Amino acid sequence: MQIHLNIDDLPAYPYPTNFLHFASIEPETDIEPWWLLVYNAGTINNWYKTLKQLYPERTLIPFAKFNANDDIACFDGDDFSGQPHVLIIHAYASEGWELHATYASFDKWLEEAMVQNAEWLNED
Protein backbone atom coordinates (compact mmCIF):
# COMPACT_ATOMS: atom_id res chain seq x y z
CA MET A 1 0.00 0.00 0.00
CA GLN A 2 1.40 3.38 -0.94
CA ILE A 3 1.63 5.91 1.86
CA HIS A 4 2.21 9.65 1.48
CA LEU A 5 4.38 11.26 4.14
CA ASN A 6 5.72 14.36 2.39
CA ILE A 7 5.90 17.59 4.35
CA ASP A 8 7.40 20.47 2.39
CA ASP A 9 9.16 22.04 5.40
CA LEU A 10 10.43 18.73 6.87
CA PRO A 11 11.47 16.49 3.98
CA ALA A 12 13.52 14.07 6.10
CA TYR A 13 11.43 13.67 9.25
CA PRO A 14 12.29 10.26 10.83
CA TYR A 15 8.87 8.64 11.27
CA PRO A 16 8.78 5.80 13.81
CA THR A 17 9.43 2.42 12.22
CA ASN A 18 6.36 0.87 13.88
CA PHE A 19 4.19 3.63 12.43
CA LEU A 20 5.56 3.04 8.92
CA HIS A 21 4.93 -0.68 9.27
CA PHE A 22 1.38 -0.17 10.59
CA ALA A 23 0.50 2.33 7.86
CA SER A 24 1.74 -0.10 5.18
CA ILE A 25 -0.34 -3.11 6.29
CA GLU A 26 -2.77 -4.38 3.67
CA PRO A 27 -5.64 -4.40 4.07
CA GLU A 28 -5.71 -1.25 6.15
CA THR A 29 -6.34 -1.93 9.85
CA ASP A 30 -9.63 -0.51 11.12
CA ILE A 31 -8.94 1.98 13.91
CA GLU A 32 -12.16 3.97 13.51
CA PRO A 33 -12.98 6.50 14.95
CA TRP A 34 -9.37 7.36 14.03
CA TRP A 35 -8.15 7.30 10.44
CA LEU A 36 -4.63 7.69 9.13
CA LEU A 37 -3.81 10.70 6.98
CA VAL A 38 -1.21 8.87 4.90
CA TYR A 39 -3.36 7.35 2.16
CA ASN A 40 -4.05 10.51 0.15
CA ALA A 41 -1.23 12.60 -1.29
CA GLY A 42 -0.94 16.01 0.33
CA THR A 43 -3.15 15.35 3.36
CA ILE A 44 -0.31 15.30 5.91
CA ASN A 45 1.28 18.37 4.32
CA ASN A 46 -2.04 20.27 4.37
CA TRP A 47 -2.68 19.45 8.03
CA TYR A 48 0.94 20.32 8.88
CA LYS A 49 0.47 23.78 7.34
CA THR A 50 -2.90 24.30 9.06
CA LEU A 51 -1.53 23.35 12.47
CA LYS A 52 1.57 25.53 11.94
CA GLN A 53 -0.69 28.52 11.23
CA LEU A 54 -2.83 27.79 14.29
CA TYR A 55 0.06 26.97 16.65
CA PRO A 56 3.25 28.56 15.28
CA GLU A 57 5.28 27.72 18.40
CA ARG A 58 4.75 23.98 17.86
CA THR A 59 6.21 21.64 15.25
CA LEU A 60 3.49 19.04 14.79
CA ILE A 61 3.67 16.09 12.39
CA PRO A 62 0.04 15.02 11.89
CA PHE A 63 -0.67 11.39 11.11
CA ALA A 64 -4.26 10.59 12.17
CA LYS A 65 -7.62 12.35 12.56
CA PHE A 66 -10.51 11.55 14.90
CA ASN A 67 -13.88 11.25 13.12
CA ALA A 68 -16.08 12.80 15.80
CA ASN A 69 -14.18 16.05 16.42
CA ASP A 70 -11.13 18.05 15.33
CA ASP A 71 -8.57 16.00 17.25
CA ILE A 72 -5.40 15.29 15.29
CA ALA A 73 -2.76 12.79 16.43
CA CYS A 74 0.67 14.29 15.80
CA PHE A 75 4.26 13.33 16.34
CA ASP A 76 6.39 15.85 18.21
CA GLY A 77 8.20 17.39 15.24
CA ASP A 78 11.04 18.66 17.42
CA ASP A 79 11.98 15.08 18.31
CA PHE A 80 14.17 13.45 15.65
CA SER A 81 14.91 10.33 17.75
CA GLY A 82 12.67 8.09 15.64
CA GLN A 83 10.47 7.49 18.72
CA PRO A 84 8.69 10.82 19.33
CA HIS A 85 5.85 11.42 21.72
CA VAL A 86 2.36 11.54 20.23
CA LEU A 87 0.40 14.70 20.95
CA ILE A 88 -3.37 14.84 20.55
CA ILE A 89 -4.11 18.33 19.30
CA HIS A 90 -7.63 19.73 19.18
CA ALA A 91 -7.36 21.72 15.97
CA TYR A 92 -8.88 25.19 16.05
CA ALA A 93 -8.81 25.41 19.87
CA SER A 94 -7.36 28.61 21.26
CA GLU A 95 -3.59 28.58 21.47
CA GLY A 96 -2.59 27.17 24.83
CA TRP A 97 -5.71 24.98 25.00
CA GLU A 98 -5.01 22.74 22.03
CA LEU A 99 -3.20 19.85 23.77
CA HIS A 100 -5.70 17.14 24.78
CA ALA A 101 -3.40 14.21 25.53
CA THR A 102 0.15 12.94 25.22
CA TYR A 103 1.39 9.39 24.64
CA ALA A 104 4.95 8.23 25.14
CA SER A 105 5.13 6.62 21.70
CA PHE A 106 3.20 5.60 18.61
CA ASP A 107 2.75 2.14 20.13
CA LYS A 108 1.10 3.60 23.25
CA TRP A 109 -1.16 5.77 21.10
CA LEU A 110 -2.09 2.76 18.95
CA GLU A 111 -3.03 0.74 22.04
CA GLU A 112 -5.46 3.50 23.04
CA ALA A 113 -6.75 3.85 19.47
CA MET A 114 -7.57 0.13 19.44
CA VAL A 115 -9.47 0.48 22.74
CA GLN A 116 -11.41 3.41 21.26
CA ASN A 117 -12.08 1.31 18.14
CA ALA A 118 -13.61 -1.49 20.22
CA GLU A 119 -15.78 1.02 22.09
CA TRP A 120 -16.81 2.65 18.79
CA LEU A 121 -17.81 -0.71 17.29
CA ASN A 122 -19.78 -1.68 20.42
CA GLU A 123 -21.90 1.48 20.14
CA ASP A 124 -23.61 0.14 17.01
Roles of regions detected by a PLM:
Residues 1-79, 120-122:
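A surface-exposed partner-binding patch
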Residues 31, 38, 86-89, 115:
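Extended aliphatic helical segments
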Residues 76-97:
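Intrinsically disordered, low-complexity regulatory segments enriched in Ser/Thr/Pro
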Residues 90-121:
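Compact, glycine/acidic-enriched structural inserts
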